[in-house]
Structure formats: C-alpha cells, structure tokens
Amino acid sequence: GPVRCRPPERRGSSDSTASFQVIFNFEFLLMSTILPLAYLPSVEYFTHLLRGGCVVDLGEHFVKRSERNRARILASDGVMELTVHVRNANRPRQPVRDVRLDYSKRWQHQHWGALVASYRSSPYFDFYAGRFEPFYRREWEFLADYNLGLLEVLCSLAGVPMPELSRTYVEAAPGDLD
C-alpha cells in the first residue's frame, strides 16, 4: 500500500494555524511512516510496523477498492480476494474513521468460511481461530473500529507494537514518498 514518509513536526510549535496534528515528540528530525488502516494487512505492512515510527492515519480519505476494506488470502485454489462491504463508499473526502460497515450482504459469513476452509488444517488454527472468530460474528458500526480491533489482535499475536494513531488527516508535504 501507499506509504508516505516525512520528518515529524516538533512539538510546541507556535504556529496555531497549522493544519497538522503533532504526532511525535522527537528531539531531532526522524522519518515516520504514515500507513493507511488496512483490513487484514499484508506482510509488507508488518515490516513497516516492525521498523517502528509508524502512524496509522484515521483521518485520511477512504479510497475504494483498496487495502482499507480489501484483503488477499491464499486459498487452496490460489489467491482469494475478500471485500468488507461499506456504506456510502462513493462519498467524496470521507475520512476512514467515518466509514460505516454494510451488513446487507453476508460478507462476514463468507470471509470466515474462506478463512476456515483455507487454514483449518494449519498447525495451531484452533488456537488462533478463537481470537479472530468474534470479528466475523459481531456487527461493528465503523470500518476503522473493525480494522483497529483486528490489527490489535494481529500485533499482539505477532509480538509487534501497535502503531501510533492520528485522527487528523496528515497532509502530504513536498518530498513525501507515496
């Protein structure tokens, strides 16, 4: 997924009209990685988390057909796409934190069935299944809450620290990588 890197602003700036939220308190300029909030993030996503200095941007605008509500798993017959259905996906400039889940289709049932069919013969599946199944049984209101809950479980199981969260949109700056 897209990764924007930039040095964080220093805390205590006297410019009260700045359109950014101060996220870190570092003495010197360091690079931070701004990540989208992803559904069942990829291995690449976790490599960024392991490097540290990551911020998940909850204020970014929702992008249709992206990792925010799509994931890919390896099924017995190849790669399978999983899509979390959301309401009003076409609303322009909608922050990810405001995107609501749509339960008119049985996507949770389909996703859990695909995960079980693909991984039930894997070692320790029964141990891990208990941590993930609630995400496919309970109805969540917001995509961000759903994805954050999954990310917390994944990070906990993998021993990876949770990233910082920014609830304010982080504007791209000149020199950012995208």
Please state what every model-predicted region is.
Residues 14, 24, 175-177:
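Intrinsic-disorder/low-complexity regions
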Residues 31-178:
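Residues lining hydrophobic/aromatic ligand-binding pockets adjacent to catalytic sites
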Residues 13-19:
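Serine residues within intrinsically disordered or low-complexity segments
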Residues 23-31:
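Short, basic, low-complexity termini and linkers enriched in Ser/Thr/Gly/Pro
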